[in-house]
């Protein structure tokens, strides 16, 4: 790939305030986990409170692959993107360990409030009575990176 062609598709680092804005407004992304070397990625709703990312693990049916893979301290990566064209996109990657949110604590109330504030629930999980499992997890960011491309092609 020529340098000029690469430059047309590569991004530039996002400002911290733009990263924060995307995490607060998008409400959904792709969460990647790893089980014995096999990657597992899923679309997921999330809430962001300015420090932590809250992830609801929801399941319909008797088993949840997410719940089987995750344990306290499992490292996850959340990818959040907006794409409105070939040369107009933003992408934020957040990596860090997962911590369980106990439903009998004040933190669980914070988890629910944050999801209510800026989370976005997938259509398949609109009916709470159809869920067999609901777990709260907190992703503690160790690395947050953002790239964007908001211009037309390079001439």
Regions found by a protein language model. Give the residues of each.
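A generic structural signal for nonpolar/aromatic side chains embedded in well-ordered alpha-helices
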Residues: 23, 69-70, 115
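An N-terminal domain-cap segment
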Residues: 2-43, 47
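A generic structural signal for short beta-strands and their flanking turns/coil linkers
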Residues: 27-29, 42, 49-51, 72-76, ...
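A short mixed-secondary-structure module that forms the rim of ligand-binding clefts
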Residues: 47-84
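Charged, gly/pro-rich active-site loop segments
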Residues: 2-8, 86-155
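Amphipathic alpha-helical interface surfaces
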Residues: 19, 62-66, 107-111
